[in-house]
Amino acid sequence: MRCFSCLNTQTNDMRINIDTLSDLTDYASVATKIDPRGTGSKSGILVNGKVNSPKPGGGARSFTFKELAAATKNFREGNIIGKGGFGSVYKGRLDSGQVVAIKQLNPDGHQGNQEFIVEVCMLSVFHHPNLVTLIGYCTSGAQRLLVYEYMPMGSLEDHLFDLEPDQTPLSWYTRMKIAVGAARGIEYLHCKISPSVIYRDLKSANILLDKEFSVKLSDFGLAKVGPVGNRTHVSTRVMGTYGYCAPEYAMSGRLTIKSDIYSFGVVLLELISGRKAIDLSKPNGEQYLVAWARPYLKDPKKFGLLVDPLLRGKFSKRCLNYAISITEMCLNDEANHRPKIGDVVVAFEYIASQSKSYEDRRTARKSTDSNRLRRETKQSY
């Protein structure tokens, strides 16, 4: 039996046999029995064509509650960098000097023991440049804490919505770069792992950013193993965030990897429009982003009405048209008609590269015009 050695059923702690867990932790048992890609492996999870044996907490360190209290100055309110139904996230500094983000789960919150276990299992097995790195965890009494690498720029929603007066809006290129990073993270879960993993909680709040605006997907407590063998979907209780859930999943609990594609389409719409998936402060008819955008998505002549005014027209119209066309495909009500994530990655890599070229040309033109104006001003004297 493989288990978290720090967890003990004789106290308030948990002891976990990963071979009998449900949800994503079923990966341990499912992956040892099934290899739908035909390699014949029976000893673990296929990641990038190689077998990974699930070892919960494998690369993650077990922290004491005292260590994490010291790192956050006793969970001082001034150290809080995020809050939600799950609890609070604190900025902390470990004894080694490493700056980290520490998520303290609320015992009465939305994220319970099961989701905690799923997240530790998942981030201990799966590693990718676009997935957040789990440094460690703590299970002391009723306390459940997760320790992640610190992302200095916060989440995507911090840079799209309710900006401070002195805050610079994201450029078009940066938005497309973020779309590429998020898509690559999803591609890893869908295509590089066997069986596939359905993220189930893709939203702007879970897209973290470093100083270069490179993406790290976070919060995997709701992740689910995708359908295997001849199964077309997974039937499960509806979880996730309202406004991002695919219609077939929200209505019937039928979950597939295409459910993530729909959620990605909502994020794309947020990137393009600068609007929230749900914003009850908007007038009636504009509160639900997808419903508001539908008429514009179907008419290329109205694409411009979707664009965030803060972009001030500083983007290639051709790149905008491409991005909106793909967004519309991702938001198709019919799951089977949504694109594969691999195709989405290729498309947005192209859009991002073209957007960068456009931005570079625009900057060069601006510099040339500025130099010419300076020369003309000097000559006039």
Curated annotation (Swiss-Prot):
PROSITE patterns reported in the protein's UniProt record: PROTEIN_KINASE_ATP, PROTEIN_KINASE_DOM, PROTEIN_KINASE_ST
Lipidation (S-palmitoyl cysteine): 3
Membrane topology: Lipid-anchor
Subcellular location per the Swiss-Prot or TrEMBL entry: Cell membrane
Residues with the Phosphotyrosine modification: 148, 249
GO BP terms: defense response
Alphabetically ordered keywords of this record: ATP-binding, Cell membrane, Kinase, Lipoprotein, Membrane, Nucleotide-binding, Palmitate, Phosphoprotein, Plant defense, Serine/threonine-protein kinase, Transferase
Gene3D superfamilies documented for this protein: Phosphorylase Kinase, domain 1 (3.30.200.20), Transferase(Phosphotransferase) domain 1 (1.10.510.10)
The name this protein goes by in its record: Probable serine/threonine-protein kinase PBL22
Protein species of origin: Arabidopsis thaliana (Mouse-ear cress)
Organismal lineage: Eukaryota, Viridiplantae, Streptophyta, Embryophyta, Tracheophyta
